[in-house]
Amino acid sequence: MAIQHPDIQPAVNHSVQVAIAGAGPVGLMMANYLGQMGIDVLVVEKLDKLIDYPRAIGIDDEALRTMQSVGLVDNVLPHTTPWHAMRFLTPKGRCFADIQPMTDEFGWPRRNAFIQPQVDAVMLEGLSRFPNVRCLFSRELEAFSQQDDEVTLHLKTEEGQRETVKAQWLVACDGGASFVRRTLNVPFEGKTAPNQWIVVDIANDPLSTPHIYLCCDPVRPYVSAALPHAVRRFEFMVMPGETEEQLREPQNMRKLLSKVLPNPDNVELIRQRVYTHNARLAQRFRIDRVLLAGDAAHIMPVWQGQGYNSGMRDAFNLAWKLALVIQGKARDALLDTYQQERRDHAKAMIDLSVTAGNVLAPPKRWQGTLRDGVSWLLNYLPPVKRYFLEMRFKPMPQYYGGALVREGEAKHSPVGKMFIQPKVTLENGDVTLLDNAIGANFAVIGWGCNPLWGMSDEQIQQWRALGTRFIQVVPEVQIHTAQDNHDGVLRVGDTQGRLRSWFAQHNASLVVMRPDRFVAATAIPQTLGNTLNKLASVMTLTRPDADVSVEKVA
């Protein structure tokens, strides 16, 4: 697909395997993951530096697991507040929905507050670990074109200098107003909310109460959120007829803050910004050699804090697949599973976020009265209360098709869901999270059994060529039993008993886990070989000895 571009003579040429448009969180995560896989990456960003004002304020357990996968979670955690509850309040201050899940099945707290600019800075600094990754700021993407085996990008610097980039693949992480998506004429379906919200960030938190509160005031709904490093965020609905300029005026800002603070004059304002809440979804996530990710593919209201986290899911899902294709270990048909797996869940998160917004600010006042009464009654039903407390309403990603092999009834199958991440004990006595023992790899994890037993020599060669780790899980008391050791198999102890419970619940003794920690297949030793053949087929894996030419950019 060719796209018209100016007749320009580039002064600088770049040749890479992957070009990423946009140095936001999704682009930076993609670059970190591909960087550690040895892929040549160039990130191009229109701005002259990272955005330094707070935007997203919620990071979940899945996103922290993604940070862990690229070795950055220890640097991210100091900028988070774990176990961050969300409470919906009536106009009189009564809590009618309390969301504070205390589960950590993926290894991290489910809800966390965070400061996005500081976490983005951690990811940018993380790129310095990889000589094969570069990030260029002050580069405006003016045009691009696709050929059979590459994408050509035309850039312009602040000084007007022209540059060209030739890449095998382009990942568009250039935001909700994505130039790439618009240029490709990909429909961005959905709607824009009629109401805007003004966000006010304050240093030296004048309240210092923990958690986040959503006050469902019919006169002017507002949000009060405690953030790390003593930052307080308030969000107020902008009412019809009000403008950002008016609300920024000192007397009007004082009036807003007097609603939530006893002394609105004694505050240290960081900044105020007006946001519009959109709920939109790209019709396609892959267009030949261009892939859309993050806000370029979907945008949603902020009320469940899932815009940022959905972008992290995109990056984790796409990066390992793109690396396999570039390395010649899979055909590019594998990239079609990115949209197949991610689009439906992104739609579910959009719908959840819209619903949460309607709970906070119902379109009709009578709906708010009904909400308050019904919620008061439901809170006296323990199952309903647990449903909110444990955040069970959040649609957990589950893939029904794509890079996986499903056996049996889909409703009860763990295939297509994220695998748990408990602590395990290594043979040297160290206790660590499961992913740390696996690295950024596939894993075949067996309960009590040698995971290689049911595999042919050819299969072992094929999966080892992918970097697969073969894990035998045993009760912790058996970890030092030398007679159970097998060459090429890592033995770990089930420190918390969670792996035993998981395998018992799902009636399987072997799991094939993808690099993004999703269950690709389950089996028992006698069926593993057949299951791996099916999985290799649906993932379009190549044979290690096959004559596969890895694409190179001229």
Curated annotation (Swiss-Prot):
FAD binds at residues 17-46, 285-295. The keyword Oxidoreductase applies. Pathway: Aromatic compound metabolism; 3-phenylpropanoate degradation. Its EC number is 1.14.13.127. One of its GO terms (biological process) is 3-(3-hydroxy)phenylpropionate catabolic process. It catalyses: 3-(3-hydroxyphenyl)propanoate + NADH + O2 + H(+) = 3-(2,3-dihydroxyphenyl)propanoate + NAD(+) + H2O; (2E)-3-(3-hydroxyphenyl)prop-2-enoate + NADH + O2 + H(+) = (2E)-3-(2,3-dihydroxyphenyl)prop-2-enoate + NAD(+) + H2O. Its cofactor is FAD. GO terms for molecular function: 3-(3-hydroxyphenyl)propionate hydroxylase activity; FAD binding. The keyword Cell membrane does not apply. Keywords: Aromatic hydrocarbons catabolism, FAD, Flavoprotein, NAD, Oxidoreductase. Belongs to the PheA/TfdB FAD monooxygenase family. HAMAP family: MhpA (MF_01652). Catalyzes the insertion of one atom of molecular oxygen into position 2 of the phenyl ring of 3-(3-hydroxyphenyl)propionate (3-HPP) and hydroxycinnamic acid (3HCI). NCBIfam families: PRK06183.1-1 (NF004827), PRK06183.1-3 (NF004829), PRK06183.1-5 (NF004831). This is 3-(3-hydroxy-phenyl)propionate/3-hydroxycinnamic acid hydroxylase. The lineage of its organism: Bacteria, Pseudomonadati, Pseudomonadota, Gammaproteobacteria, Enterobacterales. The gene is mhpA.
